[in-house]
């Protein structure tokens, strides 16, 4: 297994979503939808981890406000949009944007949960599951900029409520799906799902298989200063990377209703994946690298709900990912020849108890406890080809570790409705976080106020605090090689969790125009950065804790339409961002930047019978920063054609993304004696997908065996 914690190498900035809103009778309804930033290669990851999100508002979909959350009718919002799975559907929500292959909401990292159940799975594993779930499974979505403690989540949360029952008892429904995407290389996906609804028992089954090849390039130019003799070395490297992969995903969910508000449910998620990568470098350095990785995931969760408001549950996760790499590299008089194996095995358990009370006069009370524990078994070994073992080879020392992590969370909160116009929700959580390095107690308050002054007008004020923990592999004391060996990826066992404080004010005017202001302050923000070593010709990629990061922003989203043939929205954002680190090697910095973002999304109805729609989305973003990195202006343009037929049960979709091949920025460093430019490849992609929903039929009734005369 090769874990790459370094500055990413590819990014697709695609503006996808378009949605709408509508005021229905006496309900306060509104929509929003979001732009998306897609990353194509792991090495571009950290560049987009902290870029601003884009909240986009449409005109047709509906949303209702309640205490601390917005309830969206997402199935209506994605009608006519090129959305085939739950992950893509969530990007239609207001303020949701994809950065580094992960979803963010309102300038914050966001936790996505299914049916209110927080999982032990990592973000990447959860997103893989969401991408395999058909969008048709969504019943509704709850969005919270600051989730109350009773949800066992801190910070922003998206709760996806799945459909578990369809029609009358005995009904079975399913979907088959196929996808072909041609970028530089081709990739494919096949998926099948079934949903069964009984009188007391319901079940869902899903299998998905994604596979294909990928290709990308990196053109690096560097001026590397050496302290010993004051010389500057010119580095020009060109890298090509080809990879192929297979991923199999499986989900089985069951629900059994014992009585009203009395139920038992179990969900299993499994995955098996393989990948093989070959990388070649030419120029100042010549290198060839071959690597592979295999991973297994097993996750099971049991939930029990009682009529008195008591909930209890347990979850287990097992993950294993061994990998290897063979590298031959030459740079001047230096040579690297080695074979390395690494791996990670994680066992994680979670147990919880939660109690909720609905009291008189609009009061609600909730409290509970959550305990999680995990053990991370990781290793990394190096073998020199000539010595056949890691002796006097100059390679990193072998590492084998067993790291245990424990978290205990105790919380209590209340909610109160003051008539129909004012709602409040407050909670307080106390948490202990214990690892071999840290043993800390923290307090997390959350406050949400919602005010509905009139029909179509919504005002929501939020304040929260949050803590985000580093990835397991990021805190291992390991060293990996990247780009033929000129770049090294270092783990950081002393990496701290980051603490975030955020507040936001959202105002929706006439259920149509959305205005939002926000401010975030993150202490000990963990960011992976590049640093040119002054002692040797070596680039270091390592996660470090900045002193803090601050972001403040304003946003206006304006939907408009022309007749029945065009739905559009324009989103404008102004953002101020600041990052400070007083102990960044020998180069302390305190940098800030003002930038703007403009997004225009259009859906053209070419025909209603047959149902044919064209979407054209464009985005332009100004210069941003990440530490001493300067991220230049970038943009993206995409188009999608969607044909729905067979009574809405069949959908054929074709697309062209990154039409102008301008979505990939070329980040650079020009700070003190640090001088680097990375040019990453950007390829236009075209694709075709087909989805067919079937069923809605009842289970056949078969004649029972006559046992009336048996004993």
Segments from the language model and where they lie:
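Outer-membrane beta-barrel signature, preferentially recognizing the C-terminal barrel domain
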Residues: 467-516, 521, 541-553, 561, ...
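Short acidic/polar hinge/loop motifs at secondary-structure boundaries
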Residues: 119-146
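Face-selective signature of the C-terminal outer-membrane beta-barrel domain
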Residues: 201, 247-273, 290-445, 450-458, ...
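Outer membrane beta-barrel strand-and-loop segments of large Gram-negative receptors
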Residues: 348-350, 496, 502, 514-572, ...
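Extracytoplasmic beta-strand/coil segments of soluble accessory domains associated
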Residues: 87-122
